[in-house]
Amino acid sequence: MGAQKGMLTQAELEQLVATGDIDTVIVAFTDMQGRLTGKRVSARLFVDDVAEHGAECCNYLLAVDVDMNTVDGYAISSWETGYGDMVMTPDFSTLRLLPWIPGSALVMADLSWTDGKPVKQAPRSILNRQMDRLAERGLV
């Protein structure tokens, strides 16, 4: 297992999938309400496809309230403009076991549009931009 307790490398995940110890991978991101959301995929599909290509999801997931109802006021997602697709690209530095869900692993994802441009409004994208700004100033 990875250097930190519960953390996994991609190779370790592949081995756990091959032995049947992991059967599900949750590919997740934080929505505008601070909740973890995303997709649950079979571990074999994750290893064979999602790890390299990512997984698509609807941008609706960024723009709903706590009851999963659509909310007015989001320029990127509405009934007027439509609900488009985003790509969740796994960040393997976040790959970890989920001990409270046996047989499962979790990986956080960076969001981009299907044309490859980052989803600037995604909380993780905002955080990464702020971390870059701090690094430019020598603060991290």
State what each model feature region is.
Residues M1-V140:
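ATP/Mg2+-dependent ligation/transfer catalytic cores
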